[in-house]
């Protein structure tokens, strides 16, 4: 085994204080890539689109419902974060965000007295995490909801197996749907 084939990742059980309970998420804390020292290999920059297939491969190998990759954004106090299932990148994952914050505080990368600001890779949403009274408070952005009408609404009703005799008062989607 060569040193470049050794990678550290965390498995965090979110929403619980009990081992093997809650909702597990994988977390990898990556360097920013300035020195070539990252979690993704010697020359892989986590903010480079060319590394997305590597992140996808790692998430498939970890094989949890979601794996979060996070790194300190260049020239910023924020942390970038991307989320992958074993098969696809997703825009947002609450329990993986919680898990990433827990790892950053627990490893000492961020003092527990400081809030963490994450910026998502898909959609560029800002997420904030802070420790308050021994619990993690997460603040997610409000999303603008748009009404779903016409053919799109009919497709949605069909997907749920609902017929015309079901009264739907409204259907909405967010900007990332």
Question: Where in this protein do the model-derived segments appear?
Answer:
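Active-site proximal loop and beta-alpha junction motif in alpha/beta enzyme cores
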Residues: 2-92, 98-177
């Amino acid at each position: 085994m060569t040193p470049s084939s050794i990678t550290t990742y965390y498995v965090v059980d979110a929403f619980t204080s009990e081992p093997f309970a809650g909702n597990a998420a994988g977390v990898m804390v990556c360097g920013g890539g300035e020195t070539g020292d990252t979690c993704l290999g010697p020359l892989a920059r986590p903010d480079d689109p060319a590394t997305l297939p590597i992140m996808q491969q790692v998430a498939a190998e970890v094989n949890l419902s979601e794996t979060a990759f996070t790194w300190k954004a260049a020239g910023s106090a924020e942390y970038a974060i991307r989320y992958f299932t074993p098969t696809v990148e997703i825009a947002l994952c609450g329990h993986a965000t919680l898990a990433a914050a827990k790892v950053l505080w627990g490893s000492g990368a961020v003092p527990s007295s400081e809030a963490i600001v994450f910026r998502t890779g898909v959609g560029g949403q800002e997420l904030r995490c802070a420790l308050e009274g021994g619990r993690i408070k997460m603040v997610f952005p409000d999303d603008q909801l748009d009404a779903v009408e016409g053919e799109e609404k009919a497709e949605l009703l069909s997907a749920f197996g609902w017929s015309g005799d079901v009264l739907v008062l409204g259907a909405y989607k967010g900007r990332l749907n």
